[in-house]
Amino acid sequence: MSRISRQAYADMFGPTVGDRVRLADTALWVEVEKDFTIYGEEVKFGGGKVIRDGMGQGQMLAAEAMDLVLTNALIIDHWGIVKADIGIKHGRIAVIGKAGNPDVQPGVNVPVGPGTEVIAAEGKIVTAGGVDSHIHFICPQQVDEALNSGVTTFIGGGTGPATGTNATTCTPGPWYLARMLQAADSLPINIGLLGKGNASRPDALREQIGAGAVGLKLHEDWGSTPAAIDCCLGVAEEMDIQVAIHTDTLNESGCIEDTLAAIGDRTIHTFHTEGAGGGHAPDIIRAAGQANVLPSSTNPTLPYTINTVDEHLDMLMVCHHLDPSIAEDVAFAESRIRRETIAAEDILHDMGAFAMTSSDSQAMGRVGEVVLRTWQVAHQMKLRRGPLAPDTPYSDNFRVKRYIAKYTINPALTHGIGHEVGSVEVGKLADLVLWSPAFFAVKPALVLKGGMIVTAPMGDINGSIPTPQPVHYRSMFGALGAARHATRMTFLPQAAMDRGLAEALNLRSLIGVVNGCRRVRKPDMVHNTLQPLIEVDAQTYQVRADGELLVCEPASELPLAQRYFLF
């Protein structure tokens, strides 16, 4: 039997079981747990390679073969870190297994035929497209920035750069919901809209859900009173949609105890649960320990660095329409920015108490940095806290699974869309991101949307090959014309579907129906289920979880940073 060195094999077909891969310039390493391919029967495309007629490519009709195969991919997802071929059919993940020609090769369950396209994923990492669940729809160009960072789904609200949208993630009322759904129909990204949840009577909330809102957002700038919270959650329970909340920083209508009492045992998604982005000062972070609270962070506080506090004060004044010449506005801003709770947030993420990360796009958050900042936190926490059991000093598989779940499967489950997106699993939309390991979490090599390339780095268009400088991200055919409608999804609630809303608005995209929002609890947050008793000292702002003081020094240097953005 012929033999090949492990290094030569990895160079040719990518890493296999037992091989370790470093994630960009972080301190994080993953180890391949399983290889679905068969040694000696691997498929690869190119001159003199395997995927040729009668060899790795069979004679079957298109109905019996894949539309697209990603060969020899290293999949990193919440369920595992594995080597496999990925078969895509009709824009969805059809098979994760062994590609080739079943007429001449054993163990093939990803058939390659004359109607099959190939993407060479040898030496590449494949992850699910990110789900950003805190979007202010301030400008449509956010979509390009997000796609270029590896995010393929938006949940949020807004109507453009209106004063209300600059501060709150709400698309208020049926008219604006209709217009934004029509606008979203042309954007090459999955979208679900949040309506305004601040009302003390239910009819206006039911009206918005019937008009297409997949969730409701309670925001202190509209008045997050106990009455509004109770009313909003009552409607959510009735109509199976999610509620997101930005609580009362000033504690005017009640403190955190009053908010938790108004919520009761009903499921709710708490935005920027640390508090710098808004919420009961100084102790909204306590909510992360509740079984019915699904806590997320927005990315400006991630990770805690020597510049975090200074940057936040200026951001806050702009986003919430505050006046630096008014003492009360300055006091409001300063009450929200606390070093101690920001530092504790990173640790609570590492412990699995905070379940999600998101952006807060252009409203105290950066839409293109959800993925990047999530992994910066993971890196910092490995340096500060060492390996997470059962990891070793040489492999960080569990930590990697915990952190990737924060911006993929967990926000998808939270908002009732986990059956369509959020992971690399059979049956889901083929929203996939390819990364070279050296550029992981920073600059994708390709982004697939519904099985079609939607954006990619591309060189000189007049070049004789695709790679000459200048290379920068450009929209691809998946983002153009009617192809967008076949590869993107608009999410709607069942109430809107029952009214025939998609037909009434002439929406041409795929439609996904949110469901199961009210059943999701903290134990359902993949790899992020911890429910510690969190305490905050009202004078010093020190944070304890189950009695342990949570402190860490701010970072002065980070990976995934300047060395990647010189050009």
UniProtKB/Swiss-Prot annotation:
It comes from the Bacteria. This is Urease subunit alpha. One of its GO terms (biological process) is urea catabolic process. Carboxylation allows a single lysine to coordinate two nickel ions. Ni(2+) 1 binds at residues 134, 136, 217, 360. Its cofactor is Ni cation. Ni(2+) 2 binds at residues 217, 246, 272. Belongs to the metallo-dependent hydrolases superfamily. Urease alpha subunit family. It is an enzyme of class 3 (hydrolase). It comes from Pseudomonas putida (strain ATCC 700007 / DSM 6899 / JCM 31910 / BCRC 17059 / LMG 24140 / F1). Binds 2 nickel ions per subunit. GO terms for cellular component: cytoplasm. GO terms for molecular function: nickel cation binding; urease activity. Substrate binds at residue 219. The modification N6-carboxylysine is found at residue 217. NCBIfam families: PRK13206.1 (NF009685), PRK13207.1 (NF009686), urease_alph (TIGR01792).
